[in-house]
Amino acid sequence: MSNFIPGEIIPEKGEIELNLGKEIRTVTVSNSGDRPVQVGSHYHFFEANKALIFDRKITFGMRLNIPAGTAIRFEPGDTTDVKLVPFSGLRNVYGFNSLVNGSLDN
């Protein structure tokens, strides 16, 4: 019998560098609301909750530079710097707050 567990993932040793070669942009974000706001790894940051105060124009087409499936939580009154990277692939964005619903490049 094998010692492997079904569905088990055994990663190689060492560090995995995320978003290698992508432009990284740092943005200062403040939560002006009275509730925490959580933003996921692949959320179009430009469309994030309106209680988050930041330069939205420079975040168009960008997402958080964090591992897939994770998120950053912004507590009320807190200000923090986050790192963003551009979406890649087809660069089509649908849903979120319905501000784009199409190509990020047109």
UniProtKB/Swiss-Prot annotation:
* Gene Ontology molecular-function annotations: urease activity
GO BP terms: namely: urea catabolic process
Q: Give the EC class as a word.
A: hydrolase
Alphabetically ordered keywords of this record? Cytoplasm, Hydrolase
| Biological pathway | Nitrogen metabolism; urea degradation; CO(2) and NH(3) from urea (urease route): step 1/1
Does the entry feature the keyword Zinc, yes or no? no
Q: Carries keyword Protein biosynthesis?
A: no
CDD domains in alphabetical order = Urease_beta
Q: Which Pfam families match?
A: Urease_beta
The chemistry this enzyme catalyses reads:
urea + 2 H2O + H(+) = hydrogencarbonate + 2 NH4(+)
Enzyme Commission identifier(s): 3.5.1.5
Superkingdom classification of source = Bacteria
InterPro entries named among the record's database cross-references: Urease_beta-like, Urease_betasu_sf, Urease_subunit
A GO term from the CC aspect: urease complex
Q: Where in the cell is it found?
A: Cytoplasm
Protein family according to the UniProt entry: Belongs to the urease beta subunit family.
**Partners and quaternary state?**
Heterotrimer of UreA (gamma), UreB (beta) and UreC (alpha) subunits. Three heterotrimers associate to form the active enzyme.
Name listed for the protein in its UniProt record: Urease subunit beta
Lineage runs: Bacteria, Bacillati, Cyanobacteriota, Cyanophyceae, Synechococcales
Q: Its encoding gene is what?
A: ureB
